[in-house]
C-alpha cells in the first residue's frame, strides 16, 4: 500500500504514530542474567547454583567432578531452569582460560572453589597441603577473576562474590596456611572493590563461620568420623544458608552494595568461641 502523506504531500517522519503502527508486533527481548559459580559440585557452591537458578539466572556451574555437575544440571533443568556445566580445576590457569574465555556476558560471579587441607602445627605441616590451599583458594580465585572481570567491565557492570572465611581475620592454631589463604581473599576483595568501582562492578566478600559441608572431611583427608566431631553439640550453618545470603545481596538496587557479610551459627561467636550443647 502507498505510504500515507501529511499535509504538503510528504510521508510522515519515521517514529510517528503512522510509522510505529507498522511495527506493533516488535517485542523487546530481555536476555536472562548469567551467573558463574565455581566449586559447584557440593556444599556452598551447589546450594548457590540451585538458589540462583530459582532467582531466574542461567547458571554456569564449574567443578572437578563431572558426575556431580551433571546431577546438578539435571536438578536445575527439572525445575525449569537452565544450567551449563564446565569440568576443570581452577588451579590450572590454562584450563581456566580455555573454559571461561569463550563465555559471553557474565553478570554474577561466585568465587567459591576452595578447600582446607590438614590441621597441624606449622613445623609439622605437609607442604603438599599448603600448595593445594594456596593454589586453589588464592591463585584459582585470581585466575577466574582475571578472565571474568573484563567481561563485566565491557558490559558496564556485574557482581563478584568471593567466599572467604572468618579464618581470614581470626587466625587459629594449626591453621596457619588456610588462614593465610583466606586472609588473602579478604585483602584481594578489598583491593578488587577499589579497582572495579568506576566500572559499576560490585564486590561482596562472604566470611562464614562453621558451615556443615564436605569441608572438614576434605581437611582430614577422608576421615569422616573426625570430621563429624567438628560439629558435635553445634547446629552449624548450611550451604543453603550461605546461598540465601548471596541471593539477597545480589538483588539489592544498583546504588547499594554489601561489601562484607560475616555469617555465623548462633552458637558461634568467633573462631575460638563456640557454645557446644551436651
Feature annotation, model-predicted:
Residues 165:
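Residue(s) in the substrate-gating loop at a strand-loop-helix junction
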Residues 67, 87-98, 127:
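The beta1-alpha1 cofactor-binding region of Rossmann-like NAD(H)/NADP(H)-dependent oxidoreductases
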Residues 57-71:
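Conserved glycine-rich Rossmann-like NAD(P)H-binding loop of the short-chain dehydrogenase/reductase
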Residues 205-206, 213, 224-272:
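C-terminal helical subdomain
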Residues 120-122, 126-131:
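Substrate-binding pocket helix/loop in short-chain dehydrogenase/reductase
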Residues 41-42:
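Conserved glycine-rich cofactor-binding loop
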Residues 145, 181:
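Active-site helix of classical SDR
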Amino acid at each position: 500500500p502507498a505510504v500515507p502523506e501529511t499535509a504538503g504531500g510528504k510521508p510522515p517522519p519515521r517514529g510517528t504514530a503512522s510509522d510505529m503502527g507498522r511495527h506493533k508486533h516488535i517485542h523487546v527481548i530481555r536476555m536472562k542474567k548469567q551467573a558463574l559459580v565455581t566449586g559447584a559440585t557440593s556444599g556452598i557452591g551447589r546450594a548457590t547454583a540451585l538458589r540462583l537458578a530459582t532467582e531466574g539466572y542461567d547458571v554456569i556451574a564449574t567443578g572437578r567432578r563431572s558426575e556431580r555437575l551433571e546431577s546438578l544440571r539435571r536438578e536445575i533443568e527439572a525445575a525449569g531452569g537452565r544450567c551449563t556445566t564446565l569440568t576443570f580445576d581452577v588451579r590450572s590457569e590454562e584450563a581456566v582460560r580455555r573454559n571461561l574465555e569463550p563465555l559471553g556476558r557474565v553478570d554474577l560471579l561466585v568465587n567459591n572453589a576452595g578447600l582446607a587441607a590438614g590441621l597441624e602445627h606449622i613445623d609439622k605441616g605437609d607442604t603438599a597441603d599448603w600448595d593445594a590451599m594456596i593454589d586453589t583458594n588464592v591463585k584459582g580465585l585470581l585466575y577466574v577473576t582475571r578472565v571474568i572481570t573484563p567481561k563485566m567491565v565491557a558490559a558496564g557492570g556485574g557482581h563478584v562474590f568471593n567466599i572467604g572465611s572468618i579464618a581470614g581475620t581470626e587466625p587459629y592454631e594449626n591453621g596457619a596456611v588456610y588462614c593465610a589463604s583466606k586472609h588473602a581473599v579478604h585483602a584481594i576483595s578489598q583491593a578488587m572493590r577499589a579497582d572495579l568501582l568506576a566500572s559499576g562492578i560490585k564486590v561482596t566478600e562472604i566470611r562464614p563461620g562453621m558451615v556443615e559441608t564436605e569441608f572438614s572431611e576434605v581437611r582430614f583427608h577422608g576421615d569422616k568420623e573426625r570430621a563429624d566431631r567438628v560439629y558435635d553439640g553445634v547446629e552449624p550453618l548450611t550451604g543453603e544458608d550461605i546461598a540465601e545470603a548471596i541471593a539477597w545481596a545480589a538483588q539489592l538496587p544498583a546504588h547499594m552494595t554489601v561489601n562484607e557479610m560475616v555469617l555465623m551459627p548462633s552458637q558461634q561467636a568467633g573462631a575460638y568461641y563456640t557454645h557446644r550443647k551436651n
